[in-house]
Curated annotation (Swiss-Prot):
GO CC annotations, alphabetized: nucleus
Coiled-coil stretches: none
Bias-annotated ranges (Low complexity): 24-34
A Gene Ontology biological process term: cell differentiation
Protein name: Homeobox protein HEX homolog pha-2
Chain residues forming the annotated DNA-binding region: 124-183
Keywords: DNA-binding, Homeobox, Nucleus, Transcription, Transcription regulation
One Pfam family in the UniProt entry: Homeodomain
Subcellular location: Nucleus
Disordered, as annotated region: 1-50, 180-214
Lineage of the species this protein comes from: Eukaryota, Metazoa, Ecdysozoa, Nematoda, Chromadorea
CDD domains: homeodomain
Length: 214
């Protein structure tokens, strides 16, 4: 009896105890295969996270920790989007229109890049000041009577034509230069026939000695 009891005691000690495994309340971390399956089920999230995969040089599919954190973040963002009324069922931060964002970024620069868009037609174009027909006619009419303007007359004329005093002064300077050039060209044309006749007569006398003694 003692020996049998002793053997049974040994067998009982050698037999592994059938204890229930401890259950953990924490959710297990998904492995790489589970992560890839969950990502493939959500095509929208997979497409949006494609640039992030390239940033990690392909390590995102094989790192369960990064995959687990990414899934939790995406789930939280999706849940926040569902709680908002009228919000689409996708990640709000990843659903951004890139073209619209770039357009809004460039809008404040338009006035700085293209200052000529806000200028009136008589402003500079091609390096020259453009005047309207009414302004040109008024300036020509004033130039016919006054080749030079006093500061008071220039200020009054500029105000009546919606121009600056500098523009009026520059126009009169250019107009006087053109007027002198036209006058000089006209005087040269008037002198050309007389000069040509004198030269012709001199050549004729030198070629015919009898005319020189007449």
């Amino acid at each position: 009896m003692d020996q049998k009891f002793y053997i049974s005691s040994l067998l009982q000690e050698d037999t592994p105890s059938k204890e229930k495994p401890e259950t953990s309340s924490e959710s297990p971390i998904p492995t790489g295969s589970e992560c890839s399956l969950n990502e493939s089920s959500d095509t929208t999230l997979d497409q949006k996270m494609e640039p992030n995969k390239k940033m990690f040089n392909g390590t995102l599919d094989f790192n369960p920790w990064i995959c687990h954190v990414s899934q939790q973040l995406a789930a939280q963002l999706s849940q926040n989007g569902k709680n908002r009324p009228g919000a689409p069922n996708q990640v709000p931060l990843l659903n951004m229109n890139v073209n619209q964002t770039m357009g809004n970024m460039w809008d404040p620069r338009l006035s700085w890049l293209y200052p000529y868009m806000s200028k009136s037609p008589q402003k500079r174009k091609g390096g020259q000041i453009r005047f309207t027909n009414e302004q040109t006619d008024a300036l020509e009419h004033k130039f016919d009577s006054h080749k030079y303007l006093s500061p008071q007359e220039r200020k009054k004329l500029a105000k009546s034509l919606s121009l600056s005093e500098r523009q009026v002064k520059t126009w009169f300077q250019n107009r006087r230069a053109k007027w002198r050039r036209v006058r000089k060209d006209g005087e040269d044309e008037d002198e050309m026939p007389n000069g040509a006749s004198a030269r012709s007569l001199g050549q004729l006398q030198s070629s015919n000695p009898f005319l020189s003694h007449g």
